Amino acid sequence: MAQTIYVLNGPNLNLLGTREPEIYGRATLADVEKLCAETAAGFGLVAVCRQSNHEGQLIDWIHQARSEKVAGLVINAGGYTHTSIALHDALVGVQIPTVEVHVSNVFAREDFRHHSFIAKAAFASLCGFGIDGYRLAITGLAAKLGASATA
């Protein structure tokens, strides 16, 4: 049976493709989810993609990942990246390998975006690669899990 990973997207990521396309590009959340599913499958993994604008829902999914023995997490916490100690604590608490990803280069933007509570709970962080960052995140997560690319 294939290992499962969760790809969690936070607030406003449902607006990808229409929200500030000069920063986030024109790809939609559906495009991200398709990319994640295809990339994960290439390593024999199954990606379960979820998005919520609510911090508590994201925390519930992180907790669920532990109870369902999910192998790894990719998270784009959106604006909660810079504010949510609760998300940090949830990630630390479940002890599941996690990669943080952001579509834009948060360090080339406003100062308040330069701090991440998520990064301290993740083994890797990626930003500025557009939606390709998700492919890179899953590739790195697969390597951490010992999953090899399938033919």
From Swiss-Prot:
<feature type="binding site">
    <location>
        <position position="82"/>
    </location>
    <ligand>
        <name>substrate</name>
    </ligand>
</feature>
<dbReference type="InterPro" id="IPR018509">
    <property type="entry name" value="DHquinase_II_CS"/>
</dbReference>
<feature type="active site" description="Proton donor">
    <location>
        <position position="102"/>
    </location>
</feature>
<dbReference type="GO" id="GO:0008652">
    <property type="term" value="P:amino acid biosynthetic process"/>
</dbReference>
<comment type="function">
    <text>Catalyzes a trans-dehydration via an enolate intermediate.</text>
</comment>
<keyword id="KW-0028">Amino-acid biosynthesis</keyword>
<dbReference type="Pfam" id="PF01220">
    <property type="entry name" value="DHquinase_II"/>
</dbReference>
<dbReference type="GO" id="GO:0019631">
    <property type="term" value="P:quinate catabolic process"/>
</dbReference>
<comment type="similarity">
    <text>Belongs to the type-II 3-dehydroquinase family.</text>
</comment>
<dbReference type="InterPro" id="IPR036441">
    <property type="entry name" value="DHquinase_II_sf"/>
</dbReference>
<comment type="subunit">
    <text>Homododecamer.</text>
</comment>
<feature type="binding site">
    <location>
        <position position="89"/>
    </location>
    <ligand>
        <name>substrate</name>
    </ligand>
</feature>
<dbReference type="InterPro" id="IPR001874">
    <property type="entry name" value="DHquinase_II"/>
</dbReference>
<keyword id="KW-0456">Lyase</keyword>
<feature type="site" description="Transition state stabilizer">
    <location>
        <position position="19"/>
    </location>
</feature>
<feature type="active site" description="Proton acceptor">
    <location>
        <position position="24"/>
    </location>
</feature>
<protein>
    <recommendedName>
        <fullName>3-dehydroquinate dehydratase</fullName>
        <ecNumber>4.2.1.10</ecNumber>
    </recommendedName>
</protein>
<dbReference type="GO" id="GO:0009073">
    <property type="term" value="P:aromatic amino acid family biosynthetic process"/>
</dbReference>
<dbReference type="GO" id="GO:0003855">
    <property type="term" value="F:3-dehydroquinate dehydratase activity"/>
</dbReference>
<comment type="pathway">
    <text>Metabolic intermediate biosynthesis; chorismate biosynthesis; chorismate from D-erythrose 4-phosphate and phosphoenolpyruvate: step 3/7.</text>
</comment>
<dbReference type="GO" id="GO:0009423">
    <property type="term" value="P:chorismate biosynthetic process"/>
</dbReference>
<feature type="binding site">
    <location>
        <position position="76"/>
    </location>
    <ligand>
        <name>substrate</name>
    </ligand>
</feature>
<keyword id="KW-0057">Aromatic amino acid biosynthesis</keyword>
<feature type="binding site">
    <location>
        <position position="113"/>
    </location>
    <ligand>
        <name>substrate</name>
    </ligand>
</feature>
<feature type="binding site">
    <location>
        <begin position="103"/>
        <end position="104"/>
    </location>
    <ligand>
        <name>substrate</name>
    </ligand>
</feature>
